[in-house]
């Protein structure tokens, strides 16, 4: 059962060099130490958090969802699915590595070498593509830390695999170019996610032979289920977030270490704020570290996928592969990928049009797009990924004015694709695949001062007609003084009636995909 921590008796100030720490304790919770600052690790305290302006303005972040699971190039969740008897990943592992009772995920980790990884060159590409923040994988469900981890000394990127501080090198490359820097953590799900590694085949020559996750010599990677119910490994549901207190404390210490070493501007968690007191303490620590760095101002962002976590202060909502159904009152974020989260060979990627349409649609609803370009184990983007990145670069060079530092207008758009976002089991995430393709009849709006940017989601035949910008439309925009098209140097022929704004298209398109009409109000 989750318990909400009360303020009463929670805080006592202690001194420790070089940091001042808040020590907070409960009878049922180990002592959790966090940076001294404006926040305690309680929901009541975190209500006063406000999302910083940089996140409101940034609109586009790029992400390297990258680690040892990228090395086989088989896509998502390889570290778990290779232990699912009969699955495609299990069969692939048998063919290329051997049986998981002998050769398991521990033997995949050394094949993650990052031998072609050039973080400086990649960051140049990301900056040109228009990213204002960059997010590095910190640790995935596979329990492998991508930094020089104090609390996971054997299974981290400095001690094994590439033998480099991946997070630190990404951080340096990003901040050198003026980007905000984020890290993602998926660790809270790891304890029961790895249950499959503790099983065995049910049939065949290896029936009943335990997989290598049962070997206590590797419990620091696969976890120890000692003290758990006898059938835990068989019954555990992936990402059920079932874990003993010892694991929750391990989680707290590791992510706190990540924050302390790399001071991210953004910390993303793959789910809700985990483990109540432990997770809330991490959020508070993250914000307090930021306050120390910025003269008392909290410039940090924490992403949770649980709407209730973000209902009043606390953090910024993130929707995985999804979108909200209206203009959200606070800045939020979609995280998605052009393919699989982990690199998969020969997969079909999102087209540049889909990426551009998503960006304009999300920004019109007060959101940011965090887009993953998955790296293979070598660390080099493939040619098809580079083509998508190049197309995004060209589009943002023309249309970035209507994206960055804008705010939503009175409505996010108009056109045939204005139906509410379909929910998945009552949740707004994971709905991107069920959304209709946007057409030239669809329009998305952003605004900045007395300017309204109308993104027409394709090249219309002859004329763009925008009903919401009619002088007497329901939105009451007022009189339009001038209309321009971003990327087009000539004057446009246009007219505003009571019912619409009509704009004649010039002979040539200024860019591919969506075009931006810039309407200046009187």
Regions found by a protein language model. Give the residues of each.
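A general, composition-driven signal for non-globular sequence regions
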Residues: 1-2, 17-20, 50-53, 59
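N-terminal export signals
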Residues: 2-3, 7-28
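Mature catalytic domains of secreted/periplasmic carbohydrate-active enzymes
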Residues: 28-522
């Amino acid at each position: 059962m989750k318990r909400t921590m009360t303020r009463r008796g929670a805080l006592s100030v202690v001194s420790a060099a070089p940091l001042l720490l808040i020590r907070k304790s409960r009878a049922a919770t180990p002592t959790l130490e966090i940076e001294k600052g404006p926040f305690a690790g309680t929901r009541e305290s975190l209500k006063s958090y406000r999302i910083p302006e940089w996140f409101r303005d940034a609109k586009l972040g790029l992400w390297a969802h990258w680690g040892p699971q990228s090395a086989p190039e088989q896509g998502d969740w390889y570290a778990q699915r290779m232990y699912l008897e009969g699955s495609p990943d299990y069969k692939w592992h048998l063919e290329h590595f051997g049986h998981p009772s002998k050769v398991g995920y521990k033997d995949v980790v050394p094949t993650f070498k990052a031998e072609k990884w050039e973080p400086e060159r990649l960051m140049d590409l990301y900056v040109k593509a228009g990213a204002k923040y960059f997010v590095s994988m910190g640790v995935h469900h596979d329990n492998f830390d991508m930094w020089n981890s104090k609390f996971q000394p054997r299974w981290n990127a400095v001690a094994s695999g590439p033998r480099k501080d991946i997070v630190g090198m990404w951080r340096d490359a990003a901040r050198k170019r003026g980007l905000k820097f984020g890290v993602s953590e998926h660790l809270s799900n790891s304890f029961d996610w790895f249950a499959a590694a503790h099983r065995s085949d049910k049939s065949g020559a290896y029936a009943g032979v335990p997989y290598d996750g049962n070997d206590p010599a590797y419990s620091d990677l696969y976890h120890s289920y000692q003290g758990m119910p006898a059938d835990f490994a068989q019954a555990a549901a992936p990402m059920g977030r079932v874990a003993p207190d010892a694991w929750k404390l391990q989680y707290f210490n590791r992510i706190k270490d990540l924050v302390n070493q790399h001071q991210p501007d953004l910390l993303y968690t793959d789910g809700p704020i985990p483990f109540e007191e432990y997770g809330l303490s991490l959020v508070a620590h993250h914000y307090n570290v930021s306050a120390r760095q910025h003269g008392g101002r909290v410039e940090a962002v924490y992403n949770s996928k649980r709407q209730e976590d973000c209902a009043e202060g606390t953090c910024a909502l993130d929707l995985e592969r999804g979108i909200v159904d209206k203009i959200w009152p606070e800045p939020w974020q979609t995280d998605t990928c052009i393919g699989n989260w982990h690199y998969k060979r020969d997969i079909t990627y999102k087209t540049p049009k889909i990426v551009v349409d998503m960006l304009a649609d999300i920004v019109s609803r007060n959101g940011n797009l965090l887009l993953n370009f998955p790296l293979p184990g070598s660390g080099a983007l493939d040619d098809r990924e580079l083509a998508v990145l190049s197309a995004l670069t060209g589009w943002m060079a023309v249309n970035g004015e209507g994206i960055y530092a804008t705010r939503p207008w009175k409505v996010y758009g108009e056109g045939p694709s204005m139906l509410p976002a379909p929910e998945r089991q009552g949740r707004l995430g994971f709905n991107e695949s069920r959304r209709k393709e946007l057409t030239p009849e669809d329009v998305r709006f952003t605004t900045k001062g007395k300017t309204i940017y109308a993104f027409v989601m394709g090249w219309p035949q002859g004329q763009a007609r925008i009903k919401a910008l009619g002088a007497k439309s329901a939105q009451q925009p007022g009189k339009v003084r001038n209309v321009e098209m971003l990327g087009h140097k000539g004057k446009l022929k246009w007219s505003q009636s009571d019912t619409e704004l009509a704009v004649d298209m010039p002979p040539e398109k200024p860019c591919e995909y969506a075009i931006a009409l810039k309407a200046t109000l009187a």
